[in-house]
Curated annotation (Swiss-Prot):
A motif (Required for optimal activity) lies at residues 303-305. GO terms for cellular component: endoplasmic reticulum lumen. Belongs to the glycosyltransferase 61 family. The keyword Signal applies. Catalyzes the transfer of a single N-acetylglucosamine from UDP-GlcNAc to a serine or threonine residue in extracellular proteins resulting in their modification with a beta-linked N-acetylglucosamine (O-GlcNAc). Specifically glycosylates the Thr residue located between the fifth and sixth conserved cysteines of folded EGF-like domains. Its EC number is 2.4.1.255. This is EGF domain-specific O-linked N-acetylglucosamine transferase. It comes from the Eukaryota.
Length: 535
């Protein structure tokens, strides 16, 4: 009897434990969101625009009580309460009232436009989300699939950007030398897919064939294959993840390398995907490595290390989804030598890029500070364009109690790039000589001023970049108050203003800095806005 009683008690305990475990599992299932919202990982301001273009995710969010973006039936983001009508601007259904933003034009330049409205539209198409609309409208399928599972190749004009499915690349006979972008790297049959290629139309796209302007050289031998690479076992390696191919500009120069990152961001918009669960393959036909001083930035775009094309040498590789990214030096591209209409500034595209990178790299705004303007001076330790009387200028700034002055030298061996970005993003006035370091202006807060102390007669470079970002720009105005060390000594061109060092009149310098401080204090986004001329 005692044994029977013990058995009954043990059975009850087992059933109770089993019930508790089932309840725990059920609660776990109930608590689990129906979509991995964390993977979206976009700035809060961008979420409504993302959901506008991903209605299936918006639908899941609407039905999911645990969706972090849900604040009502048609609203997202408790912080902004933006309607799902919000759109970047390039979408066909996008109405102008719901665009992310629209540029400002202060005047009309003759030869470009007759009125402000036309000037705004031109600038929007040149350098804002209208630029993406133009690229989307150009997309053409050159290699068409016949049945489900076939390959495809779709490109913008001049093959500046392409998308491929079930792409076949044969690197078994790859021959590498010193050329980073060898034009005859592939022979017929070594790159292609099982699809129907319009050869004549495809080869007509080669008008801008150039290493950093087009993918024509790499794709000109694209072949319509008589086999299905994946189905017929022709692949030594199959890459399942979406893969971005990129031809990179100089990785040691911030200005040039950020042309790569900006164009990758634009490419993501074209493909409506900001996932970091992607591969990025550096397209380089040489046997060299690649020096990259800004490698931390890749974390904004991928969870994985950058792959070199040569990693696949001696293999036949098949990519289920491949994207050939927009390139850094395209004619009329962004932002290298881009011809821009004068008088206009403030693209939503470049502001969104800045927000995107800062968010993904966890760079936060720690200010601004009430009663203080944070001034950062970018020093140079290079041979040329040094500020000879830098200490004198800094001491003058420190006599103004409202200015909080910091001098930095962005040496990559001493200061990680993420820390450089943190300093830049927490500056209200950013001062530096002409040079690639001024590309940091992309990551200044909206109210900031960039002061190119002296442009060395290269007037448009950082002025135009500041216009794209929507940051106020000033530079030295009185030539008789800047003092070059000598005439400059270019290695081959002789006298050159970029190849010497400079001293500056302290009084004029202070006048310009105080003008900049006044602009900051009156900016609409400055939380401690003061009356005109307080500085």
């Amino acid at each position: 009897m005692f044994i029977l009683l013990m058995f009954v008690l043990l059975l009850q305990e087992i059933l109770a434990n089993s019930r508790d475990e089932n309840l725990t599992e059920l609660n776990s299932v109930l608590e689990e969101p129906t979509y991995s919202y964390r993977a979206i990982n976009l700035p809060a301001e961008h979420i409504p625009y993302f959901l506008h273009n991903n209605r299936h995710i918006a639908g899941i969010c609407k039905q999911d009580s645990r969706c972090p973006y849900k604040v009502g039936f048609y609203f997202v983001l408790h912080k902004y309460l933006k309607k799902l009508k919000s759109c970047w601007g390039y979408e066909k259904s996008c109405k102008s009232d719901y665009r992310f933003s629209y540029p400002v034009c202060d005047y009309v330049e003759s030869g470009w436009a007759n009125d402000i409205e036309t000037a705004q539209q031109i600038f929007w198409k040149q350098a804002d989300f209208g630029y993406i609309r133009e690229r989307l409208n150009e997309m053409k399928t050159h290699c068409k699939p016949t049945v489900t599972g076939d390959s495809s190749l779709t490109c913008s004009q001049f093959l500046q950007h392409c998308r491929a499915t079930n792409l076949y690349i044969d690197l078994r006979t790859a021959k590498r030398n010193h050329e980073r972008f060898k034009e005859d790297f592939f022979q017929k049959g070594e790159i292609g897919g099982h699809c129907t290629l319009d050869v004549k139309a495809f080869l007509a796209e080669g008008q801008r064939k150039s290493p950093l302007q087009s993918w024509f050289a790499e794709l000109q031998t694209f072949t319509s294959l008589n086999f299905r690479p994946l189905d017929d076992g022709k692949c030594d390696i199959v890459i399942e993840k979406p893969t971005y191919f990129m031809k990179l500009d100089a990785g040691v120069n911030m200005y040039h390398h950020f042309c790569d990152f900006v164009n990758l961001y634009i490419t993501q918009h074209i493909n409506n995907s900001f996932s970091t669960d992607v591969n990025i393959v550096m397209w380089d036909t040489s046997s060299y490595g690649y020096g990259d001083l800004f490698s931390e930035t890749w974390k904004a775009f991928t969870d994985y290390d950058i792959i070199y094309l040569k990693t696949f040498d001696s293999k036949r590789v098949c990519f289920k989804e491949a994207v050939f990214s927009l390139l850094p030096r395209m004619r009329y591209g962004l932002f290298y030598n881009t011809p821009l209409i004068s008088g206009c500034h403030g693209t939503g595209l470049f502001r969104a890029f800045s927000q995107h990178v800062l968010h993904r790299l966890n760079i936060t705004q720690e200010g601004p500070k009430d009663g203080k303007i944070r001034v950062t001076i970018l020093a140079r330790s290079t041979d040329y364009r040094k500020i000879l009387n830098q200490n004198e200028l800094v001491n003058a700034l420190k006599t103004v109690s409202t200015l909080e002055v910091k001098v930095v030298d962005y040496k990559y061996k001493e200061l990680e790039f993420s820390e450089q970005l943190r300093i830049t993003h927490n500056s209200d006035i950013f001062i530096g000589m002409h040079g690639a370091g001024l590309t940091h202006l992309l990551f200044l807060p909206d109210w900031a001023v960039v002061f190119e102390l002296y442009n060395c007669e290269d007037e448009r470079c950082y002025l135009d970049l500041a216009r794209l970002r929507g940051i106020h720009y000033i530079t030295w105005r009185k030539r008789n108050k800047v003092f070059p060390q000598d005439q400059g000594h270019h290695p081959t061109l002789g006298e050159h203003p970029k190849f010497t060092n400079y001293s500056f009149d302290v009084e004029e310098f202070m006048y310009l800095v105080l003008l900049a401080a006044n602009h900051v204090s009156q900016h609409s986004k400055w939380p401690f806005r003061v009356k005109h001329d307080e500085f």
